[in-house]
């Protein structure tokens, strides 16, 4: 069998290519044609992050010519494969690949190409308090690059996980503790600090506010002439705005510090969306925010969206 295959492969007879020789029945132009879910190693140059990541790529071109039966997917694959050569992803590099994809399909009258990359950016994160303690945190990233004629557009989407504590629940918890304290000490004209401390040690957490793991999915436009993608800067800005990003390695002192951060950053889902949007305004073009609180009080989630307010348009 192997000898037969070798003889066949060594023949010079051209192989048929029906995408060139056969006409498309009922020919119509197609908006996009290509591939999804291609495994690809890519390099990402972000401070404090692992450089090499495993990405999944989607790539397509338009097919305006109604008579052309199909595109040349192997051409797209080979051009996409060049992104795995170890060179760090950049706006210029992505734009170059898209131009090459369009050029490779001139026989299809192709004028547009698009590329989507999905990967986890692995960042080293220090503990809040403990010196020398750190761990790795993965941030899901999506890069969308589109070339339409001479117009190049690039967007980045990142997902940041954080903790949210409900302000209403916190107020109700404080009210319960307040009433319990008055019931215990309201009849006393003078209360010893030691007695108060002892009571608080036992009863201060008799009612606790509900909190939950939450996520912010943020998309921004990236400049075509940027030297890098600037992903970790975007992530840091989001985490700083929220104030309670989830931690990696912790000791008791770090867990206590995290509890203090949660207490100082009580927020509804509306608060979180507004915080992030305000932090991005003026720093990133066309920011769009979607936040989700995976409620511990309810079996459903609380969600909110935020987008830039257009001049002359109502805020809501």
Swiss-Prot record:
Signal peptide annotation: none
Pfam family, one: GCHY-1
Site (May be catalytically important): 166
One Gene Ontology term from the biological process aspect of the record: tetrahydrofolate biosynthetic process
Pathway: Cofactor biosynthesis; 7,8-dihydroneopterin triphosphate biosynthesis; 7,8-dihydroneopterin triphosphate from GTP: step 1/1
Keywords assigned by UniProt, alphabetized: Hydrolase
GO molecular function: GTP cyclohydrolase I activity
Catalyzed reaction equations: GTP + H2O = 7,8-dihydroneopterin 3'-triphosphate + formate + H(+)
E.C. number: 3.5.4.16
NCBIfam families: PRK13674.1-1
Family classification: Belongs to the GTP cyclohydrolase IV family.
Physiological role: Converts GTP to 7,8-dihydroneopterin triphosphate.
Matching PANTHER family: GTP CYCLOHYDROLASE MPTA
Name of this chain's protein: GTP cyclohydrolase FolE2 1
Organism: Burkholderia lata (strain ATCC 17760 / DSM 23089 / LMG 22485 / NCIMB 9086 / R18194 / 383)
């Amino acid at each position: 069998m192997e000898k037969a295959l070798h003889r066949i492969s060594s023949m010079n007879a051209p192989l048929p290519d029906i995408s060139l020789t056969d006409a498309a029945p009922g020919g119509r132009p197609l908006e996009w044609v290509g591939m999804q879910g291609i495994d690809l190693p890519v390099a990402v140059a972000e401070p404090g992050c692992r450089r090499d990541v495993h990405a999944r790529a989607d790539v397509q071109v338009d097919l305006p010519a109604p008579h052309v039966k199909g595109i040349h997917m192997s051409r797209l694959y080979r051009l996409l494969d060049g992104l795995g050569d170890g060179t760090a992803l950049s706006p210029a590099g992505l734009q170059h690949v898209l131009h090459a994809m369009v050029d490779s399909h001139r026989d299809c009258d192709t004028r547009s190409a698009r590329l989507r990359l999905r990967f986890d950016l692995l960042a080293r994160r220090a503990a809040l308090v403990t010196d020398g303690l750190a761990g790795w945190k993965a941030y899901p990233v999506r890069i969308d690059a589109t070339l339409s004629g001479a117009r190049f557009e690039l967007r980045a989407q990142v997902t940041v996980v954080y903790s949210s504590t409900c302000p209403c629940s916190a107020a109700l918890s404080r009210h319960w503790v307040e009433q319990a304290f008055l019931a215990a000490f309201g009849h006393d004209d003078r209360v010893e600090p030691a007695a108060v401390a002892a009571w608080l040690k036992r009863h201060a957490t008799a009612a606790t506010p509900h909190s939950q793991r939450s996520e912010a999915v943020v998309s921004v436009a990236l400049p075509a002439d940027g030297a890098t993608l600037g992903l970790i800067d975007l992530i840091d800005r989001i985490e700083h705005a929220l104030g309670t990003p989830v931690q990696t390695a912790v000791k008791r002192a770090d867990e206590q510090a995290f509890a203090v951060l949660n207490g100082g950053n009580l927020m509804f889902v509306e608060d979180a969306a507004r915080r992030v949007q305000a932090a991005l305004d003026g720093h990133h073009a066309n920011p769009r925010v979607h936040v989700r609180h995976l409620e511990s009080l309810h079996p459903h989630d609380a969600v909110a969206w935020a987008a830039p307010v257009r001049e002359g348009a109502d805020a809501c």
